[in-house]
């Protein structure tokens, strides 16, 4: 067996995170569960998935598997000659390897309540919704407790029974001959598939899983002043738990759409204002749009391009403090590209009054243009 087979069984890459491995396991486990999939070979594939997950979900087992393959994950790597060694107070090499590779009292009780998986849902907000806050209804698919069997997986009127093979532990002991001698390891029970229970008569709605798909709707209150990437946690709105465990949580990830007028950094809002050179030279009073409505702003005479004015309290709310941010207005002086004769005369008079000499560029004739063209060749 190569060192990627377990990853291939779950359909994940070798550098997959534990969350990705867990999700892949749940998907493959449901796909090949013997109570659901009656196709030939499904049960063996289910066992293969269980074996792969048992190793890859444990950090120490996974590390050993990545280095030595399946033998490493089972404790069967290294030199020989120690088969009959008794380590006194350590309980022997079998117990030492058992503590590292899945044996003994470290096994999780399969019948213990477990919380369901968390979910993520991405919500788009307009620029203004992020500033002022909003309440949104979101709808998504999730695994819910089966309404027919109340999560037991058994047909109404019946109950799951303790597994006769593993006696409810969910695991069985398997002896394996290794270079270190006979090693005992614990593996998932091949009868109850780790649940510790047998369902003689599965529920017809959920086919024994205890869960069913549903479309769930919930209202999300989004506070004022949020930004892209922030999350809101809704407790108990994730997927159904196991063995009576609580639902997981829903994490709402916020994405603020850009504005055509404004930019934002934290509680500060930025706005670019275009003005004429006449307004810049003589000064003016203009209306400035803000998210709170238009406000008047005075432009002093002699204002230069790049000058920044601050409108106090016209920014976004501060999430972790009182009050509002500010709006910064950056001035950009626009030079006209077309002037009529009257405007040109006025500017020439201004230049003359300022002691400036303005040379009017000569228009090039036909021969000048030909000369320039030949020089470029």
Swiss-Prot record:
Its main location: cytoplasm. It comes from the Bacteria. Zn(2+) 1 binds at residues 146, 149, 203, 206. GO terms for molecular function: ATP binding; heat shock protein binding; unfolded protein binding; zinc ion binding. The keyword Metal-binding applies. One of its GO terms (biological process) is chaperone cofactor-dependent protein refolding. Binds 2 Zn(2+) ions per monomer. PROSITE patterns: DNAJ_1 (PS00636), DNAJ_2 (PS50076), ZF_CR (PS51188). Pfam families: DnaJ (PF00226), DnaJ_C (PF01556), DnaJ_CXXCXGXG (PF00684). Residues 5-69 form the J domain. Zn(2+) 2 binds at residues 163, 166, 189, 192. Its cofactor is Zn(2+). Participates actively in the response to hyperosmotic and heat shock by preventing the aggregation of stress-denatured proteins and by disaggregating proteins, also in an autonomous, DnaK-independent fashion. Unfolded proteins bind initially to DnaJ; upon interaction with the DnaJ-bound protein, DnaK hydrolyzes its bound ATP, resulting in the formation of a stable complex. GrpE releases ADP from DnaK; ATP binding to DnaK triggers the release of the substrate protein, thus completing the reaction cycle. Homodimer. Belongs to the DnaJ family. This is Chaperone protein DnaJ. It comes from Streptococcus uberis (strain ATCC BAA-854 / 0140J).
């Amino acid at each position: 067996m190569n060192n990627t087979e377990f990853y291939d069984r779950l359909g994940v890459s070798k550098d997959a995170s534990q969350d990705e491995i867990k999700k892949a396991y749940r998907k493959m486990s449901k796909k090949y569960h013997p109570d659901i999939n009656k196709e030939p070979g499904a049960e063996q594939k289910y066992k293969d998935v269980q074996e792969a997950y048992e190793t890859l979900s444990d950090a120490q087992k996974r590390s050993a598997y990545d280095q030595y393959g399946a033998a490493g994950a089972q404790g069967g790597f290294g030199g020989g000659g120690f088969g009959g060694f008794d380590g006194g107070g350590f309980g022997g090499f079998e117990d030492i390897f058992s503590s590292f590779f899945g044996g003994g009292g470290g096994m999780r009780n399969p019948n213990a309540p477990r919380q369901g998986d968390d979910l993520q849902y991405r919500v788009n907000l307009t620029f203004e919704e992020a500033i002022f806050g909003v309440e949104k209804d979101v709808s998504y698919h999730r695994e819910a407790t089966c309404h027919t069997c109340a999560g037991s997986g058994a047909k109404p009127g019946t109950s799951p029974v303790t597994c006769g093979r593993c006696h409810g532990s969910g695991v069985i002991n398997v002896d394996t001959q290794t270079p270190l001698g006979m090693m005992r390891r614990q593996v998932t029970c091949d009868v109850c598939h780790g649940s510790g229970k047998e369902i003689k008569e599965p529920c017809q709605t959920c086919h024994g899983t205890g869960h069913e798909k549903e479309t769930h709707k919930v209202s999300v209150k989004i506070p004022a002043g949020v930004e892209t990437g922030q999350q809101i946690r809704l407790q108990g709105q994730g997927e159904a738990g196991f063995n009576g465990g609580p639902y997981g949580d829903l994490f709402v990830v916020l994405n603020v759409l850009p504005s055509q007028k404004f930019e934002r950094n934290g509680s500060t809002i930025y706005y670019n204002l275009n003005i004429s050179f006449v307004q810049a030279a003589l000064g003016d009073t203009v209306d400035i749009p803000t998210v709170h409505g238009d406000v008047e702003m005075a432009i002093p005479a002699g204002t230069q391009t790049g000058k920044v004015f601050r409108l106090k309290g016209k920014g976004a709310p501060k999430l972790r403090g009182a009050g509002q941010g500010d709006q910064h207005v950056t001035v950009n002086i626009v030079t006209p590209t077309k002037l009529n004769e009257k405007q040109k005369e006025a500017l020439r008079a201004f230049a003359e009054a300022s002691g400036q000499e303005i040379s009017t560029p000569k228009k090039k004739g036909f021969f000048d243009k030909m000369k320039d063209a030949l020089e470029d060749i």
